[in-house]
């Protein structure tokens, strides 16, 4: 595998093990040229998913995009990287199990919202603020008003 730091074509695998949920193989690699170390993941790909965007455009499903958006929403929250990886794997498996090759971006966003609602309410609101394009404080207020949580009195 090519080194992402110097571009050298031949890197060495130093450690290889399954992820916690056995959905991928995690490999630690090092580059003999520049000495950099990095991690790669090997996953099964059942089908090539295509995302249908709001404007009608189509692009290949990018699990890293989902991973990045979850990491942003969950920044400084009590959720570790392994748990985030499991969430992304679960979303990806759910999309593949639908049997459809094309999936609307809105559906992916709703899946992420569903997971975050159960996992962490703060991350849920953070994600919703970007996903639903909040522009002002009133948008947050309206959204939070719909999230009424019963109080214990």
Curated annotation (Swiss-Prot):
The keyword Repressor applies. It holds the Pfam family ATP-cone. GO terms for biological process: negative regulation of DNA-templated transcription. This is Transcriptional repressor NrdR 3. Belongs to the NrdR family. NCBIfam families: transcriptional regulator NrdR. Residues 1-26 are annotated as: Disordered. The gene is nrdR3. It comes from Paramagnetospirillum magneticum (strain ATCC 700264 / AMB-1). Residues 7-24 have a biased composition (Basic and acidic residues). Coiled coil: none annotated. Signal peptide: none annotated. Its cofactor is Zn(2+). A zinc finger (unnamed) spans 3-34. Binds 1 zinc ion.
């Amino acid at each position: 595998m090519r080194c992402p730091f110097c571009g050298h074509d031949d890197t060495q695998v130093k450690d290889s093990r399954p992820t916690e949920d056995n959905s991928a193989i995690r490999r630690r690699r090092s580059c003999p040229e520049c000495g950099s170390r990095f991690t790669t993941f090997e996953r099964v790909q059942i089908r090539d998913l295509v995302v249908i965007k709001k404007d009608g455009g189509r692009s290949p499903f990018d699990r890293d995009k989902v991973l990045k958006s979850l990491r942003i929403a969950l920044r400084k929250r009590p959720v570790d990287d392994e748990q985030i990886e499991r969430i992304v794997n679960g979303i990806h498996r759910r999309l593949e199990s639908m049997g459809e090759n094309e999936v609307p971006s809105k559906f992916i966003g709703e899946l992420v919202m569903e997971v975050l609602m159960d996992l962490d309410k703060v991350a849920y609101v953070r994600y919703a603020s970007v996903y639903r394009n909040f522009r002002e404080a009133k948008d947050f207020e309206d959204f939070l008003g719909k999230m009424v949580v019963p109080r214990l009195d």
